[in-house]
Structure formats: structure tokens, C-alpha cells
């Protein structure tokens, strides 16, 4: 049944194209190379290019055709001379032309299966006596096939050869389809599949940030599957396809000129990715030259490093990036090929045509009106460059030879010749047990490293290694320069790349955003965006997102992250500090001077009469208020913050408790004199001190409880409108600080009330009058301070300075209104600081260890009558 299936397939194939390829047609003129051997390898090469119109074949393909064909012959010669590889076994060849067409290649490949059919049905050729009939044109039995070149050719041929279990090794077919072992189970290749190349091309685009490109593919398996693999890799890297074009020979496809026009419709897609056969690439570049179009081409190995593709259109291809399979030139082949000429190469029937085409001459007189070829013409370095896949052709032939060698050693261990077990090859065994398992160092490779190993993976594919070339103009000469390589990862020498406009081209749907802008992607298109500036306090988390650094942080110069802003606070050298500190120092010195004067003249009548105990307490409070400036200017810390909260209210409490005690005493004394009451209680100096300390203690207790409930500390504070500034402040609200002064306000109000009540005392009693001046002025200062404090809350410098100056002014008011007159008399009018006469009090006298209101001390200057009662003034009438 199996034999009938093969016969039916072969018969259908033969008759579908007529009898030109049948066994009995002797009129069909076929160009082929047949060299007999013990084992014969088939060969398929694009010796000629595609024909135009109705012609099957066109001009000679000098590089990919003739060179590759001769590479196979060269490899066969070397193997046959090798004493270690297949010794005693001669390899033969049967080489056919594919004309760069898959259908034509399939017709040619039928020759390879004729021998298999003959062996299968050999009984039909036996004579009645048991002998075999004499046959003409007996086909050679093919052990394996080397080829084809184009993926479309290899796919068609592989579908045929698998039916007859003939192994096939391609040296150039890279379509990913051929890795499918369920369909191409006798196919192997010394080159990698296209998805490696597609990945390399996508990485090149990503490397240069080309995210918006056009693509052009050749019709057929190579171009279509290759560009499909590229599109998958591009999507993974957020690369968008502006337009995808396809070219081919069929009438439904666009012409090359129309493809160029379509590409020009996408002006932002300056990079064009080509996955095309060499002939299609040449035509497209020529069309671009006609349209004077300028693109940056990124091309697959279909273009590679071929001079023929860009010939005549070099200016259009300038700056192109092309890929070629990584290979080493076979120098022995160079010597072999350069030794060939039409007079010594008779086994190659296409060589004469190649010679005439290459040198534009004729080997026969008056042929095509060409000049006669000079017999001294030769192939040399001036007119020859080794084609890039010669190494892969040689490796393919050697791979088949190594597999046959191991099979022969296994099946025929006692001989170097072919034994009966190999007379009819088991192609399945050869492929699976030997070919896929070969592992040898590439012949003629000077580098004995990992890259020189020839082996196949489980899919029969070669290793993925590519060279990256740049087409450039150096010194007026165009050439390809290797600028990198790809072997799972990309490596490029960017400095060696020449661009058509002397700078790396851009190929993006939208212009690049500024360093401080993010991309706002357009719906449905990951490559087109609108640039939106980030706020000054935002950094770029990625190219699509601006992220808030958060309070207290600021983006770095390159917007890649954030850093902690330095803490801002008033420093001693700031102008905002110098003014308040100067005022506070002046006030503190004045306070110290007053204290010094009072201590020095402590026992003089004026000091005694002033209530010196309360005066010292009052002066201590004034001095403490000046010290508060230093606490508010100092860098905030838990200790400083505690001192601020404790000292501000306490300093005022000390001052106004002393004043309240004094005004209350005066008021009670005059009320007692006025009403004729008994001597008021608690008017002795010690009583007044205890009353004053009690009032102060209330404030201290309140602040202490506050400190316990809300522990002092610092916080980093940022205003919404000034995010770039981080203010180091105490962790207490401004409102809380003012609330803590509530008790002091009560003291001020009470002092003011008592000062107002004693305003009608005799005019010679000036103590009450000056206390009144002090309290009125203090109220004015505080009424002006409160709104200023709240209005300046947005600027901590102004607020702090206002606070310091207001506190200092309160101290100056006390010094100026209460103590300045006394100091003036003590220092400049000492004659008034004496006892001038005695005032007798009928109702009561006040006495104590310190200040005395009694008959012994009532002989002060000027007796005073208040509402008909005589009282003692604690100051003098001339103040």
C-alpha cells in the first residue's frame, strides 16, 4: 500500500506538468551536473534568477547561484580526498537549477525521486530469464539533498522528499515554518530560522529608539513568515508598524514604485524594515532611487552584504543596516574558485554563461555583438568577493557526509566500503539517528571555538548568529562594514556607523518629549502620544507617568527620582535674624543695666519706694522675653521647641503677674483710703511676692501639662504653593501657640483695668500713671501683632521676625515706661532720691522688711491728698 501511494503521488506530479519530465522524453534539454559515486547527493541552487514574463529562468545568479554550486563541488572534492571521512566511499552529485522559483524547483526535484521509484518497482524492469533489462538514462539513487536556497523552494521540495524519506539540508532557507517537524520531518538546515533574525532586527530598532516603522516583505514563505515573526517581536518592544507592504510577481501585488509612494505617505516612519528576497530588494531600492526617496533601511539576510542589490542606487542605500548570517570566509574556496575558467571547468554547464555575463564578453565569435573573451581573463580579488553563505553550503555537505560516515561505521563495521546494509539507504534512520546528532568542527575554519561547531537542535535548525553591517561611503567608495553582531544579545559599535544625514535618524510617530514631559498615549495607538509637562514637584516614574515626589521631596535634575529637600529655617547669619537678635541684645543689655543700677542703689529711697521685690521679678521677666528671640531664631529641635512653649508664655506671665500684683496693691490702698477702711490685707512685700509667684505658677503648670499632653518635637512643613521649600518647624500649630498665651492676655486685661481704675489718683502719684502707659501701649502692640501673625503665616521668616520684635517691644515698653524714669533720677538727679519731708497718715501705715509704707518712711517728697485723704506716693512728683 505504501508503494502504491508513492507511485500515485509521483505519477500525478509527472503528468501534471506533461511528459517533458517523464522517463522517455529525450527531447527535453536539461542542464544538470551528474557525477557518479557510491553515494550521491542531490543539490538545488538558484543558478539563474527568475525569468520575466513567460520565461521560467532569467540571467545567471553570479553569487548565490554559481558560487554556491561550486562550493558544493569543492566540498565533495575535499571529502573524496579525505582519508578519515568516508574513506573508501566516493561521493557523487546530481545538481539542478531552481531558477529562484518554487514551482520550477519542484519539477526539477522529481529527478531525485525517480531512482527511488525505480528501486521500489524494479520488478517491472526484469526480463523473463530473471536478468534486468538494459535501461537508458538510469537515475542516480540520492542519499540526501543539499538545498534549496529560498524558503519557498525548500518547503515545496521538502513536501516531496519526505514522501520518499530523503533527508534534506538547506544552507540558506530560514523560514520559521521549516522548524515544524510534524510537516517537515526530513528537513534540516545549517542556518537558523527567521525568528532569530526577526528578534535581532527588533532589538536594533529598540536600540536606536525607532518605534514607528514601515515594513516591506516579499510574497512567499521567506518574506511573509519573516515579517510576521518581526511584527510579533516588535509588539513585545512597543514598536508600531506605520504601513505594511508586500511585493511579488503576481499581478495582484503592488508595483515597486507604488510601494515607495505608500511609504512616503508616512513621513514620520523614516525607517523601513525589509524582509525580502534579494531580487525584490534590488527592485525596491531601484524604485526608491527613481523616486529620489530617502529612508533608513533595516534589511534581513535577503539583502545581507550583497553588492548586486545596491549597484547603481548606492546613494539611496547609504546608511542602511543589514543582517547577514555570521560566517567565516573559506579561504581554500577562494583559491579554488579563482582557479576556475571556461577552459578547465567542464563539469559545470552554466560556467560559460557565467563567464560571459561577468566579463561582458562572448566565448564565441560575433555572439550578441559582444567582444570575444580574452583568454587571459581570470577571477581575482579585483572582481571577486566570496558570497556570505559559502560556509553554510560547505557545512551542509560535510554534515551529510558525517552522518553517512557514522552510519557506514555502524552498519558496515568491517569495511570502509559500502556493505549490503547500505545498498538501499534507510532515509529515516539516516536523518533521525545520525544527521540530527552530528557534532563536528566546521572545516576550513581557523577559529576553533564554540562558534565553529556544526550541529543541529531538536528541530533540525542551526545556531542563531548574525553579523550586522552598515552600508557606508568611505573616501568616495561605497562598501559594507561590519558594525556588530547578534548571538541572543545585540552588540553594536555605534561609533562605526555612518548615517545618511550624519546623525542617528528618528523614526517615531510623535516627536520626542522634553526631559520634563510625559507621553500621553493616544487611544488605540501605543506609538503616538501628546507631550504633557510634569509639575515642578513631579518626577518621571516612566515615560508615560509623572509622579508626585511627595511633601518634603523634589525631583532630581534628570527627573529620574526624588531627593529630600534641605530643611529651611532661619539661620543666625540671615537678615531676618540679625534685626531681631540685635534688638533683643540691646534690650537684654538695657535690662542688665537697669538691674545693675537697682542693685547698686538697692537701699536708696527711690528703689525702696518702687517695690523692689516686684521690680526684680518684673526685670527678670523682661530679660526672659528678650531671651525668647534667641529661642525662636535657633534651629528647631525638641529642646528648643520645649523652651519656646515654656518661655514665651512664662516670660509674659512673669511681667504681667508682677504688674498685676502692683496695680492691685495700689488700687486696694487707694480704695482703702477712699472708703476709710482698715489697712488692706496682703500688701506687705512678702505677700506681694507670694501672690506674684502664685500667678506665675498658674502659667507654668498650664504649659507643663501642655508639654506632657503634646510632647515637643519638630516637623517638616511644606506649603502647597511653595512645594520647593521645606520648613523645619516645631510640631505645634500657630493657633495652639497663641492659645497658650490666653492666660497672659487675661493678666494684661486685668492690669489694664486696674491701671484704668487708678487713673484719677492724685497727679503726684505717678506709679499708677506709668503702669497705665505701659499697659495701654502693650495692648496696642498685641492688637497689632495678632493680625500680622496670622497674615504672615505663609512666610515663616516674616512671622518669626514679627513675633520676636513684638516680644522685644513689650519688654522695651516696660523698661521705657516704668524703669527709665527711675534710672534717670538715680543716675542724673540723685538730689531727688532723698527723703525731703514726712507725711503723716491718720488711718494706717504699711510696714515691712523691704518696702515700707509707715510713718518712718512716709516723709517722702510731696504729700498727696486723694479725695481728702492723705496717702504716701511711692515715687516722686517730678517723674
Curated annotation (Swiss-Prot):
Membrane topology reported for the UniProt record: Multi-pass membrane protein
UniProt keyword annotation of Hydrolase present: no
Keywords associated with the record: Cell membrane, Disulfide bond, G-protein coupled receptor, Glycoprotein, Membrane, Receptor, Signal, Transducer, Transmembrane, Transmembrane helix
GO cellular component, one term: plasma membrane
Cystine connections: 57-99, 240-527, 361-373, 412-419, 509-528, 513-531, 534-546, 549-562
Signal sequence, renumbered to the chain: 1-24
Binding site for L-glutamate: 151, 172-174, 222, 301, 389
Coiled coil residues, start to end: none
Localisation: Cell membrane
Molecular functions (GO terms): G protein-coupled receptor activity; glutamate receptor activity
One Pfam family of this chain: NCD3G
Spans within the Extracellular topological domain: 25-577, 635-688, 757-769, 829-879
Transmembrane regions: 578-598, 614-634, 689-709, 736-756, 770-790, 808-828
Cytoplasmic side: 599-613, 710-735, 791-807
Glycosylation site list: 209, 292, 414, 439
Protein's job: G-protein coupled receptor for glutamate. Ligand binding causes a conformation change that triggers signaling via guanine nucleotide-binding proteins (G proteins) and modulates the activity of down-stream effectors. Signaling inhibits adenylate cyclase activity.
Similarity-based family: Belongs to the G-protein coupled receptor 3 family.
Subunit structure: Interacts with TAMALIN.
Name of the protein described by the UniProt record: Metabotropic glutamate receptor 3
Organism of this sequence: Macaca fascicularis (Crab-eating macaque)
